[in-house]
Amino acid sequence: MLDIIFKNGKPIEAVPGGSSFNAVISLGRAGVNASFISEAGNDRIGEYVIQFLRDNGVNADNVSIFPESKSPLSLAFLDENNNADYIFYKDHPHDQLEFATPEINPGDIVLFGSFFALNPVVRPQVAGFLEYFNLILASMSASFFFASSA
């Protein structure tokens, strides 16, 4: 997702964002082995977000590109206290998240954003992924995988 931030009615910044995205970027910058699972449109925004992940040390190999989709946008309107009021735009002609399951090793950690926890449309994919993950969960080495709708 690309966040376009407005202050006093004018755009002041455009940055990739989202809660899971921000967390995985922090891990990548800290040198932690981290991957991001998501979707993007085949557009300049999608290219920018994927490159931003890579530039910050995050594996973006599991970001699925959909030629018939546009990458999601968020408009954040800041008030005088810098609290944001958001408007979200998403244009996916398909209803379900599609992704190739990445290699998961014993001890890896998976974090899902709230979209995956609440959206019944993608729940079957999340349940299947968690079943796969639970089959191999065992030791203490750690990598991080994030799934998001960004």
Give residue ranges: language-model regions.
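A glycine-rich helix N-cap at a beta->alpha junction
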Residues: 51-69, 77-79
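Ribokinase/PfkB-type carbohydrate-kinase core domain
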Residues: 52, 83-150
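Short coil/turn connectors at secondary-structure junctions
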Residues: 31-33, 71, 82-84, 106-107
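Conserved beta-strand edge residues that scaffold enzyme active sites
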Residues: 41-42, 67, 144
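Short Asp/Glu-rich motifs
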Residues: 46-47, 71-73, 147
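Glycine-rich phosphate/adenosyl-contacting loop at the front of the ribokinase-like
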Residues: 1-59
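Short hydrophobic segments within beta-strands
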Residues: 37-39, 76, 112-113
